[in-house]
Amino acid sequence: MFELNNFDALQIGLASPEKIREWSRGEVKKPETINYRTLKPERDGLFCERIFGPTKDWECHCGKYKRVRYKGIVCDRCGVEVTKSKVRRERMGHIELAAPVSHIWYFKGIPSRMGLMLDMSPRSLEKVLYFASYIVIDPKETPLLKKQLLNEKEYREAIENYGEEGFVAGMGAESVQKLLEEIDLNQVSKELKEALKTSTGQKKIRLIRRLEAVESFRKSSNRPDWMIIDVIPVIPPDLRPMVQLDGGRFATSDLNDLYRRVINRNNRLKKLLDLGAPDIIVRNEKRMLQEAVDALIDNGRRGRPVTGPGNRPLKSLSDMLKGKQGRFRQNLLGKRVDYSGRSVIVVGPELKMYQCGLPKEMALELFKPFVMKKLVQGGLSHNIKSAKRMVERVQSEVWDVLEEVISDHPVLLNRAPTLHRLGIQAFQPVLVEGRAIKLHPLVCTAYNADFDGDQMAVHLPLSVEAQAEARFLMLAAHNILKPSDGKPVCVPTQDMVLGSYYLTLDKENAIGEGRIFSSPEEAIMAYQIGDIDIHAHIKVRISKEVDGEEVCGIIDCTPGKLIFNESIPQDLGFVDRSVPGNEVKLEVDFLINKSSLGKLINKCYMKHGPTKTSIMLDKIKEKGYHYSTIGAITVSTSDMVVPEAKKRLLAETDVEVNKIDKMYRRGFISEDERYERVIEKWTKTTDLVADELMKNLDRFNPIFMMADSGARGSKSQIKQLAGMRGLMANPSGKIIELPIRASFREGLDVSEYFISTHGARKGNADTALKTADSGYLTRRLVDVSQDVIVREEDCGSKEGFEISEIREGNEIIEPLSERLTGRYSAEDIIDPNTGEILVKKEEYIDGEKAEEVEKSGVKKIKIRSVFTCKSKHGVCAKCYGMNMATAEKINIGESVGIIAAQSIGEPGTQLTMRTFHTGGVAGSDITQGLPRVEELFEARKPKGLAIVSEINGTIRIDETKKKRTVVVIGETEEISYDIPFGSRLKVSNGDVISAGDEITEGSVNPHDVLRIKGPNGVKNYLLSEVQKVYRLQGVDINDKHLEVVVRQMTRKIKIEESGDTEFLPGTMVDIFDFQEENAKAEEEGKETAKGRITLLGITKAALATDSFLSSASFQETTRVLTDAAIKGKVDPLLG
């Protein structure tokens, strides 16, 4: 058996005929597969046992040798080696072709590699290969040119004129092979380099392409004539199996059909050659052989694909690699695993944070081998076989053993789709009755799970290492923070929030108001026996030990707050304990809602770490559920109070709208202005009605409580329930100017209802499209950044990246403190007012420091950033900064690339799909939401392009009747820009503008930014633009994730002049290779290469990665492999 598991790199190359014969165990001579009577493989056929090995373990074909004791003997009668049948998965055969044929990948791909090597167009090459024209191989003394094409008539004339011996011409792959053999790579390479120095334009591009191909062959020690195939390898039979179906029929892999066609045609050609058949017949047979081999390698690439029964194209070798069902994505990147199960989930509020309920039968099946081993060890059964029988019959002793086995063996729970790493977490299993998995309610947010029939899968980590990883890294109690922004993901929701909110409410004049209790316990007891109301204002005496001394004091509170604070550590920093008299105050003395719960959990995590936080969360969960039940908060129609003022407000607006219409009819205002004003009026009215409504609602109104606490619903939903629904959009997204006046409480009439359905339908369609788009974006992001890993502690980079707050107009999108937290400073940060050093160079900035810096009024700061990291593979820990998921410094080996891709991709489904139609006469559509993110990451030219100034200067606006022109007056030159009709200007006369600033509204083309502002400018632009989209949707993503991806997009340099280096002009090289090569050239006193950084979209960047396996598994599989094989690429298997 061929075992190969420990290797560091993979190389791919062209296979020479010798190599193929070396791999092979024998030649396949017949197209037969298996004998229809005996169902045994035919000798010398496609399933031959002599070539590929026995079909049954330790048994030869004729049955002379059976049993293991004959291992390794080759049978003297049938020639089959006695060995395991598993060898049929790895032994290869070959077919000796009677005439050479070309490999379609190298002849047909773009650019055609064969065409480049011979300097011929693919069309003329095709004529020669498929026997339509002759090609002159050696003109000798005749005036014919080498590689000249001749048709039948010209060929005959040439023979008449110069005789048969006068020149050599031929057709088919043989002739091409001869020409390829003649190529002297070193000589051609020299000639091309000389020619390059003088050429320009299209010619230069063609030369560069040829040089690239020639250099690939020269460096990789592949021979160009190996692109022509003399011998075809036959892949092992178990990779193209033939299986018997129930009806006695056979199903076979398409490859067998394709191989059979090749063998049939090859044998016929051999026979024809032996018989000395006329040229034209042989030629036809050769062409058919060429076509058969093409179909085998890549069916459908040239001409019509070969079809099987039912007109279905057969799957060729290339198709076996391509696409979601191909070898890469189906078998190498994702496999199905055993020791797994799936079932429906139900809520388990009684579980601890780190537990999950596992159904008994499922657990028994999953842990079967462990249970069997324990049964034998404990002497309950004598051997494994009887233990297995015990488990299968489910005898009573088995359950006790199962409990024992399960006790310290974590399991992994996963819910599809797994959008980020919190989609798989580890839990301690608890056996439950029934057949459903029980899930802790707090981890639902991370899984995005609910209990309306969702299913989850259970996996079992087997090895000790896997169990340790599950326990220490993946346990749900350790995964409290989101890797994308470092905020808690385990925030209580719905009932838990409502219960906590209810507990911390207070009420005037409640039963027992003003009473004084000697201790919290007494107060709580008084509440439990019904003496006082849970919301009553009371006074309580509290005594605490501070620094070994007892401190007493009386505080104002409510029984509810006392109960809530029992579960909260009293040192989280909500109360300043250093102030005298504050020692005994309650930590949480405010009304709890969803956002304050988030803050609470965050503070607890930062102060006490995950374990204590998970305990606190469990307590909050229990109290929340308990008190939301006791509060008995229900919803009824009487809770929706329609405000009195609504009628009056609607009547007033009607009058106003009529006035506007009148003005329009009299021609004072345009149609567009009228429309805008009407919309504005109704929007204002809707808001006024909503405000009236909110004023009317009682603090204890159940609907108000649900919305106010953040448990469910929002102000806008209450507005629709009891206020008015307001303006709706029609299917194209334009707002209909007639509002829906009714609320749901009053009921909609038919036309109102109809208008409402537009939005709902569009919403559903959008969601479906969005999910697919978002998933594809994530996949591209993963592919581009998957090899970014923290490789070293400090790369020693001296340059920093300058950051400031991100603004959109007057609105701060991302404050400076958020951008600073968890980073290292690249310079001393000095307080502009006092001049003291706030943060030293290379110092770590935590949350408190960051806020201090922001308050001091510093506007711009240089920090260590992934952008300026000098690590060649991956990044260093200092440039990356804090690990968002643990709030600690990042460890070496952490795969930050994948985390970045997931953090950007996972919220993708929350972004909107629509392009907003901006108001105004000629408002251009500004792309937003998911399409905008995609546009930025793919570095496309955006819709609604803005005009950008190329230089620094002042603005002058010239307006004539025909057009507007903006002139930028710089120090040395002035540039004028014509403004297209309908664009909105962002500048006015006399403004001072700097290079790269927008003159009109819209989106800037990132390639322009790169040209004008340089690499740092474009990095900053991409980062802040993507942030704007996400932040406007209320999604927080930390900068560093975007930095990782953008860095991958700006890693390549396009060579402009190669100097004395190995690079070829026009090629893309990695920025680090570029610097290394140039440094080497400088040392030796040679001329260095010149190039400029290019911006690649994520798809291109993923395909341009150094690892050909990564690119091949991503997209365009055949193209990537063709290229890699010629270059003889080595994949170092990093990442």
UniProtKB/Swiss-Prot annotation:
Its EC number is 2.7.7.6. It comes from Clostridium tetani (strain Massachusetts / E88). HAMAP family: RNApol_bact_RpoC. The RNAP catalytic core consists of 2 alpha, 1 beta, 1 beta' and 1 omega subunit. When a sigma factor is associated with the core the holoenzyme is formed, which can initiate transcription. The keyword Metal-binding applies. Zn(2+) 1 binds at residues 60, 62, 75, 78. GO terms for biological process: DNA-templated transcription. This is DNA-directed RNA polymerase subunit beta'.
